[in-house]
Amino acid sequence: MIGGGVVGAAITRALALRGVAVTLLEAESELARGASGANSGILHVGFDSGPAELETELILRSARLRDPVLDRLGVPVLRCGAVIRPRDREEADTVAALKANADRNGVEVALGDDGALEVPGEAVTDPVAYTQGLAALAAAAGAEVRRDARLEAIEPAGDRLILQTGDGDRLDCSLAVNSAGLRGDEVARFVGDDSFSIYPRKGEFFVFEPPDGESLERILLPVPTKRTKGVLVFPTVDGKWVAGPTAHDQEDKDDWSVRDGAFDEVMSKARAMLPALEGAEPIASYAGLRPAGRGCNYVIGPSSPCPRLINVAAIRSTGVTASLGIADYVLGLLADAGVEPRAEREPPAGAPVPEPADPWWLRAGRREARA
Protein backbone atom coordinates (compact mmCIF):
# COMPACT_ATOMS: atom_id res chain seq x y z
CA MET A 1 0.00 0.00 0.00
CA ILE A 2 1.67 3.22 -1.18
CA GLY A 3 0.49 6.28 0.74
CA GLY A 4 -0.64 6.72 4.34
CA GLY A 5 -3.53 9.07 3.85
CA VAL A 6 -7.09 8.22 4.76
CA VAL A 7 -7.72 6.15 1.63
CA GLY A 8 -4.51 4.16 2.01
CA ALA A 9 -5.25 3.56 5.69
CA ALA A 10 -8.81 2.44 4.92
CA ILE A 11 -7.66 -0.04 2.27
CA THR A 12 -4.92 -1.36 4.57
CA ARG A 13 -7.46 -1.91 7.35
CA ALA A 14 -9.87 -3.69 5.01
CA LEU A 15 -7.15 -6.05 3.77
CA ALA A 16 -5.69 -6.77 7.21
CA LEU A 17 -9.11 -7.61 8.67
CA ARG A 18 -9.49 -10.18 5.88
CA GLY A 19 -6.19 -11.90 6.56
CA VAL A 20 -4.21 -10.41 3.66
CA ALA A 21 -0.53 -9.69 4.35
CA VAL A 22 -0.14 -5.97 3.68
CA THR A 23 2.50 -3.30 4.28
CA LEU A 24 1.61 0.39 4.28
CA LEU A 25 4.38 2.74 3.10
CA GLU A 26 4.15 6.39 4.15
CA ALA A 27 6.78 8.87 3.00
CA GLU A 28 6.31 11.23 5.95
CA SER A 29 7.08 10.71 9.63
CA GLU A 30 3.38 10.46 10.46
CA LEU A 31 0.20 9.53 8.66
CA ALA A 32 -2.25 12.03 7.15
CA ARG A 33 0.38 14.69 6.50
CA GLY A 34 -1.06 15.52 3.08
CA ALA A 35 -4.57 16.23 1.88
CA SER A 36 -6.05 13.83 4.45
CA GLY A 37 -4.95 16.04 7.32
CA ALA A 38 -5.80 19.48 5.94
CA ASN A 39 -9.45 19.57 4.96
CA SER A 40 -12.83 20.19 6.56
CA GLY A 41 -13.18 16.80 8.22
CA ILE A 42 -16.78 16.73 7.00
CA LEU A 43 -18.31 13.33 6.33
CA HIS A 44 -20.70 13.92 3.44
CA VAL A 45 -23.58 11.60 2.60
CA GLY A 46 -23.75 12.11 -1.17
CA PHE A 47 -26.93 14.15 -1.46
CA ASP A 48 -25.34 16.39 -4.10
CA SER A 49 -23.23 13.80 -5.95
CA GLY A 50 -23.98 13.33 -9.63
CA PRO A 51 -25.72 10.22 -10.97
CA ALA A 52 -23.88 7.34 -12.64
CA GLU A 53 -20.49 8.39 -11.27
CA LEU A 54 -18.04 6.12 -9.48
CA GLU A 55 -17.46 8.84 -6.90
CA THR A 56 -21.17 8.89 -6.08
CA GLU A 57 -21.37 5.11 -5.78
CA LEU A 58 -18.44 5.02 -3.37
CA ILE A 59 -19.64 7.95 -1.26
CA LEU A 60 -23.00 6.23 -0.82
CA ARG A 61 -21.31 2.90 -0.09
CA SER A 62 -19.05 4.55 2.47
CA ALA A 63 -21.99 6.22 4.20
CA ARG A 64 -23.58 2.80 4.71
CA LEU A 65 -20.37 1.37 6.19
CA ARG A 66 -19.35 4.35 8.29
CA ASP A 67 -21.13 4.27 11.65
CA PRO A 68 -19.88 0.90 12.95
CA VAL A 69 -16.31 1.82 11.98
CA LEU A 70 -16.51 5.22 13.66
CA ASP A 71 -17.93 3.62 16.79
CA ARG A 72 -15.11 1.05 16.84
CA LEU A 73 -12.44 3.70 16.35
CA GLY A 74 -13.84 5.94 19.04
CA VAL A 75 -12.71 9.06 17.19
CA PRO A 76 -14.68 12.24 17.87
CA VAL A 77 -17.68 12.73 15.60
CA LEU A 78 -20.14 15.60 15.58
CA ARG A 79 -23.35 14.33 13.99
CA CYS A 80 -24.81 17.78 13.50
CA GLY A 81 -26.34 17.71 10.01
CA ALA A 82 -26.13 20.48 7.44
CA VAL A 83 -28.36 23.13 5.90
CA ILE A 84 -28.35 25.05 2.60
CA ARG A 85 -30.26 28.34 2.51
CA PRO A 86 -30.92 29.87 -0.93
CA ARG A 87 -30.75 33.65 -1.21
CA ASP A 88 -32.66 34.23 -4.45
CA ARG A 89 -34.89 32.54 -7.01
CA GLU A 90 -32.01 31.12 -9.02
CA GLU A 91 -30.44 29.57 -5.91
CA ALA A 92 -33.85 28.23 -4.86
CA ASP A 93 -34.10 26.43 -8.19
CA THR A 94 -30.64 24.93 -7.60
CA VAL A 95 -31.67 23.78 -4.12
CA ALA A 96 -34.81 22.17 -5.55
CA ALA A 97 -32.60 20.33 -8.03
CA LEU A 98 -30.37 19.20 -5.15
CA LYS A 99 -33.43 17.82 -3.38
CA ALA A 100 -34.38 15.83 -6.48
CA ASN A 101 -30.79 14.59 -6.80
CA ALA A 102 -30.74 13.48 -3.15
CA ASP A 103 -33.98 11.59 -3.68
CA ARG A 104 -32.45 9.75 -6.66
CA ASN A 105 -29.41 8.87 -4.54
CA GLY A 106 -31.58 7.61 -1.70
CA VAL A 107 -30.22 10.20 0.75
CA GLU A 108 -32.50 11.61 3.42
CA VAL A 109 -33.07 15.36 3.05
CA ALA A 110 -35.95 17.71 3.78
CA LEU A 111 -37.00 20.92 2.02
CA GLY A 112 -38.40 23.41 4.52
CA ASP A 113 -41.15 25.96 4.04
CA ASP A 114 -38.45 28.65 3.88
CA GLY A 115 -36.76 26.85 0.97
CA ALA A 116 -33.82 25.63 3.06
CA LEU A 117 -32.55 22.11 2.43
CA GLU A 118 -31.82 20.09 5.58
CA VAL A 119 -29.30 17.23 5.33
CA PRO A 120 -29.40 15.43 8.69
CA GLY A 121 -26.77 12.79 7.88
CA GLU A 122 -23.80 15.15 7.41
CA ALA A 123 -21.20 15.00 10.19
CA VAL A 124 -17.78 16.34 11.19
CA THR A 125 -14.81 14.35 12.48
CA ASP A 126 -11.09 14.77 13.15
CA PRO A 127 -9.62 13.55 9.84
CA VAL A 128 -6.16 12.91 11.29
CA ALA A 129 -7.50 10.86 14.20
CA TYR A 130 -9.72 9.00 11.75
CA THR A 131 -6.79 8.15 9.46
CA GLN A 132 -4.49 7.17 12.29
CA GLY A 133 -7.24 5.09 13.87
CA LEU A 134 -7.82 3.13 10.67
CA ALA A 135 -4.08 2.43 10.43
CA ALA A 136 -3.88 1.43 14.10
CA LEU A 137 -6.65 -1.13 13.65
CA ALA A 138 -4.88 -2.41 10.54
CA ALA A 139 -1.65 -2.83 12.49
CA ALA A 140 -3.47 -4.62 15.31
CA ALA A 141 -4.89 -7.01 12.71
CA GLY A 142 -1.43 -7.82 11.36
CA ALA A 143 -0.55 -5.09 8.85
CA GLU A 144 2.88 -3.49 8.88
CA VAL A 145 2.85 0.32 8.88
CA ARG A 146 6.13 1.94 7.81
CA ARG A 147 6.67 5.66 8.18
CA ASP A 148 9.58 7.62 6.67
CA ALA A 149 9.41 5.12 3.79
CA ARG A 150 9.41 7.23 0.64
CA LEU A 151 9.01 5.18 -2.53
CA GLU A 152 11.83 5.68 -5.04
CA ALA A 153 11.17 3.03 -7.69
CA ILE A 154 8.93 0.13 -8.75
CA GLU A 155 10.51 -2.72 -10.70
CA PRO A 156 8.24 -5.30 -12.37
CA ALA A 157 9.79 -8.76 -11.94
CA GLY A 158 7.67 -11.41 -13.63
CA ASP A 159 4.63 -12.00 -11.47
CA ARG A 160 6.05 -9.82 -8.69
CA LEU A 161 6.83 -6.17 -8.05
CA ILE A 162 9.93 -4.87 -6.27
CA LEU A 163 9.35 -1.60 -4.42
CA GLN A 164 12.44 0.36 -3.45
CA THR A 165 12.31 2.98 -0.71
CA GLY A 166 14.61 5.89 -0.02
CA ASP A 167 16.33 4.12 2.86
CA GLY A 168 17.45 1.32 0.55
CA ASP A 169 14.82 -1.28 1.44
CA ARG A 170 13.47 -3.48 -1.34
CA LEU A 171 10.02 -4.96 -0.81
CA ASP A 172 8.87 -7.96 -2.85
CA CYS A 173 5.09 -8.07 -3.36
CA SER A 174 2.52 -9.63 -5.67
CA LEU A 175 0.45 -6.44 -6.01
CA ALA A 176 0.75 -2.79 -5.02
CA VAL A 177 -1.91 -0.13 -4.56
CA ASN A 178 -1.01 3.42 -5.49
CA SER A 179 -2.84 5.70 -3.08
CA ALA A 180 -0.19 8.42 -3.00
CA GLY A 181 -2.50 11.43 -3.24
CA LEU A 182 -0.73 14.41 -4.74
CA ARG A 183 2.14 12.13 -5.81
CA GLY A 184 -0.10 9.49 -7.36
CA ASP A 185 0.84 10.39 -10.93
CA GLU A 186 4.53 10.29 -10.02
CA VAL A 187 4.15 6.80 -8.57
CA ALA A 188 2.30 5.65 -11.70
CA ARG A 189 5.15 6.92 -13.87
CA PHE A 190 7.51 4.51 -12.09
CA VAL A 191 5.91 1.80 -14.25
CA GLY A 192 5.56 3.94 -17.37
CA ASP A 193 1.94 4.92 -16.72
CA ASP A 194 1.31 8.51 -17.79
CA SER A 195 -2.44 8.09 -18.28
CA PHE A 196 -3.35 10.72 -15.68
CA SER A 197 -1.89 13.84 -14.13
CA ILE A 198 -2.44 15.33 -10.66
CA TYR A 199 -2.28 19.00 -9.75
CA PRO A 200 -2.96 20.70 -6.40
CA ARG A 201 -6.15 22.66 -5.83
CA LYS A 202 -5.50 24.73 -2.73
CA GLY A 203 -8.22 25.17 -0.13
CA GLU A 204 -7.61 27.72 2.64
CA PHE A 205 -9.45 27.65 5.97
CA PHE A 206 -9.74 29.98 8.96
CA VAL A 207 -10.47 28.87 12.52
CA PHE A 208 -12.39 30.96 15.08
CA GLU A 209 -13.39 30.88 18.70
CA PRO A 210 -17.19 31.17 18.79
CA PRO A 211 -18.25 34.69 19.85
CA ASP A 212 -19.79 34.91 23.32
CA GLY A 213 -23.41 33.90 23.34
CA GLU A 214 -23.34 32.53 19.79
CA SER A 215 -23.85 28.93 18.72
CA LEU A 216 -23.48 27.02 15.48
CA GLU A 217 -25.59 23.90 15.53
CA ARG A 218 -25.16 22.67 11.95
CA ILE A 219 -22.82 22.80 8.99
CA LEU A 220 -23.72 25.79 6.81
CA LEU A 221 -23.39 24.87 3.14
CA PRO A 222 -23.62 27.40 0.31
CA VAL A 223 -25.51 26.72 -2.86
CA PRO A 224 -22.81 24.98 -4.95
CA THR A 225 -21.48 25.97 -8.35
CA LYS A 226 -20.30 23.69 -11.15
CA ARG A 227 -16.66 24.17 -10.05
CA THR A 228 -16.79 23.99 -6.28
CA LYS A 229 -19.04 23.41 -3.30
CA GLY A 230 -17.97 26.88 -2.17
CA VAL A 231 -17.14 28.32 1.24
CA LEU A 232 -18.66 26.46 4.20
CA VAL A 233 -18.95 27.38 7.84
CA PHE A 234 -18.93 24.48 10.26
CA PRO A 235 -18.38 23.57 13.90
CA THR A 236 -15.47 21.33 14.85
CA VAL A 237 -15.44 18.42 17.25
CA ASP A 238 -13.53 20.57 19.76
CA GLY A 239 -15.94 23.49 19.74
CA LYS A 240 -14.34 25.87 17.24
CA TRP A 241 -15.82 27.35 14.07
CA VAL A 242 -14.12 27.02 10.68
CA ALA A 243 -14.75 28.94 7.46
CA GLY A 244 -13.45 27.80 4.08
CA PRO A 245 -12.23 26.57 1.73
CA THR A 246 -11.06 28.54 -1.25
CA ALA A 247 -10.38 26.74 -4.55
CA HIS A 248 -7.08 27.94 -6.03
CA ASP A 249 -5.33 25.86 -8.69
CA GLN A 250 -1.54 25.81 -8.57
CA GLU A 251 1.36 23.70 -9.81
CA ASP A 252 3.57 23.50 -6.70
CA LYS A 253 2.79 20.35 -4.73
CA ASP A 254 4.81 21.59 -1.75
CA ASP A 255 3.28 25.05 -1.28
CA TRP A 256 0.93 24.72 1.69
CA SER A 257 0.94 28.43 2.52
CA VAL A 258 -2.18 30.54 3.03
CA ARG A 259 -2.18 33.25 0.37
CA ASP A 260 -2.45 36.95 0.99
CA GLY A 261 -6.04 37.90 0.35
CA ALA A 262 -7.46 34.47 1.14
CA PHE A 263 -9.01 35.70 4.40
CA ASP A 264 -11.03 38.41 2.66
CA GLU A 265 -12.03 35.95 -0.08
CA VAL A 266 -13.37 33.47 2.47
CA MET A 267 -14.97 35.91 4.87
CA SER A 268 -16.91 37.83 2.24
CA LYS A 269 -18.85 34.60 1.72
CA ALA A 270 -18.78 33.21 5.26
CA ARG A 271 -20.22 36.34 6.89
CA ALA A 272 -23.15 36.28 4.47
CA MET A 273 -24.09 32.86 5.86
CA LEU A 274 -23.19 33.57 9.49
CA PRO A 275 -23.33 37.27 10.45
CA ALA A 276 -21.91 36.40 13.90
CA LEU A 277 -18.51 36.20 12.19
CA GLU A 278 -18.59 39.94 11.46
CA GLY A 279 -15.46 41.43 12.99
CA ALA A 280 -14.16 38.06 14.22
CA GLU A 281 -10.42 37.42 14.03
CA PRO A 282 -9.12 33.91 13.34
CA ILE A 283 -7.08 32.04 15.93
CA ALA A 284 -5.50 29.84 13.25
CA SER A 285 -5.42 29.21 9.52
CA TYR A 286 -4.33 26.35 7.31
CA ALA A 287 -4.27 25.28 3.67
CA GLY A 288 -4.95 21.89 2.16
CA LEU A 289 -4.01 20.70 -1.31
CA ARG A 290 -6.65 18.58 -3.00
CA PRO A 291 -5.20 16.02 -5.46
CA ALA A 292 -7.18 17.08 -8.51
CA GLY A 293 -6.94 15.17 -11.78
CA ARG A 294 -6.50 16.97 -15.08
CA GLY A 295 -9.69 16.06 -16.88
CA CYS A 296 -10.29 13.02 -14.69
CA ASN A 297 -11.71 12.05 -11.32
CA TYR A 298 -11.59 8.84 -9.27
CA VAL A 299 -9.01 7.00 -11.34
CA ILE A 300 -9.33 3.57 -9.72
CA GLY A 301 -8.16 0.42 -11.47
CA PRO A 302 -5.16 -1.57 -12.70
CA SER A 303 -2.42 0.37 -14.48
CA SER A 304 -2.41 -0.46 -18.19
CA PRO A 305 1.39 -0.83 -18.50
CA CYS A 306 1.60 -2.74 -15.21
CA PRO A 307 -1.66 -4.41 -14.06
CA ARG A 308 -0.04 -5.46 -10.78
CA LEU A 309 -0.17 -1.81 -9.75
CA ILE A 310 -3.69 -0.68 -8.82
CA ASN A 311 -4.10 3.09 -9.13
CA VAL A 312 -6.37 4.88 -6.66
CA ALA A 313 -5.87 8.46 -7.77
CA ALA A 314 -7.52 11.83 -8.37
CA ILE A 315 -9.66 11.51 -5.23
CA ARG A 316 -9.93 15.28 -5.25
CA SER A 317 -12.03 16.33 -2.28
CA THR A 318 -14.00 13.37 -0.94
CA GLY A 319 -11.27 11.07 0.38
CA VAL A 320 -12.36 11.26 4.03
CA THR A 321 -16.00 10.89 3.02
CA ALA A 322 -15.56 7.99 0.58
CA SER A 323 -12.56 6.16 2.06
CA LEU A 324 -14.46 3.11 3.33
CA GLY A 325 -16.37 2.76 0.07
CA ILE A 326 -13.15 3.07 -1.92
CA ALA A 327 -11.55 0.38 0.24
CA ASP A 328 -14.49 -1.95 -0.37
CA TYR A 329 -14.28 -1.33 -4.12
CA VAL A 330 -10.53 -1.97 -4.20
CA LEU A 331 -11.06 -5.28 -2.39
CA GLY A 332 -13.06 -6.37 -5.43
CA LEU A 333 -10.30 -5.29 -7.81
CA LEU A 334 -7.70 -7.18 -5.80
CA ALA A 335 -9.89 -10.29 -5.77
CA ASP A 336 -10.08 -10.06 -9.57
CA ALA A 337 -6.27 -9.88 -9.60
CA GLY A 338 -5.87 -13.09 -7.60
CA VAL A 339 -5.87 -11.93 -3.98
CA GLU A 340 -8.21 -14.11 -1.94
CA PRO A 341 -9.40 -12.16 1.09
CA ARG A 342 -11.24 -14.12 3.76
CA ALA A 343 -14.43 -12.96 5.43
CA GLU A 344 -13.94 -9.83 7.51
CA ARG A 345 -13.05 -10.57 11.11
CA GLU A 346 -13.38 -8.39 14.17
CA PRO A 347 -10.23 -6.43 15.06
CA PRO A 348 -8.44 -7.70 18.16
CA ALA A 349 -10.09 -6.65 21.41
CA GLY A 350 -8.40 -3.65 22.92
CA ALA A 351 -6.63 -2.73 19.68
CA PRO A 352 -5.00 0.64 20.41
CA VAL A 353 -6.37 3.68 18.64
CA PRO A 354 -4.15 6.75 19.18
CA GLU A 355 -5.50 9.94 20.67
CA PRO A 356 -3.75 12.90 19.00
CA ALA A 357 -2.53 15.47 21.48
CA ASP A 358 -3.59 18.45 19.35
CA PRO A 359 -6.66 19.19 17.22
CA TRP A 360 -6.28 18.45 13.53
CA TRP A 361 -6.66 22.09 12.46
CA LEU A 362 -3.68 23.04 14.61
CA ARG A 363 -1.54 20.26 13.13
CA ALA A 364 -2.62 21.31 9.63
CA GLY A 365 -1.42 24.84 10.38
CA ARG A 366 1.97 23.48 11.37
CA ARG A 367 2.24 21.93 7.91
CA GLU A 368 1.93 25.43 6.48
CA ALA A 369 4.62 26.72 8.83
CA ARG A 370 6.96 23.90 7.85
CA ALA A 371 6.43 24.58 4.16
What are these regions (language model features)?
Residues 1-24:
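N-terminal Rossmann-like FAD-binding beta1-loop-alpha1 element of flavoenzymes
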Residues 10, 154-159, 163-244, 248-261, ...:
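Flavin-dependent oxidoreductases
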Residues 17-38:
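Glycine-rich FAD pyrophosphate-binding loop
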Residues 41-118, 230-231:
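Dinucleotide-binding Rossmann-like beta1-alpha1 core, especially the glycine-rich loop
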Residues 50, 57-60, 85-94, 117-137, ...:
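Short beta-strand to alpha-helix junction loop
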Residues 74-84, 108-141, 162-163, 246-254, ...:
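Helix-loop-beta segment of a Rossmann-like dinucleotide-binding subdomain
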Residues 121-175, 183:
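Helical element adjacent to the flavin cofactor pocket in flavoenzyme catalytic cores
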Residues 127, 133, 228, 237-238, ...:
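C-terminal catalytic lobe of FAD-dependent flavoproteins
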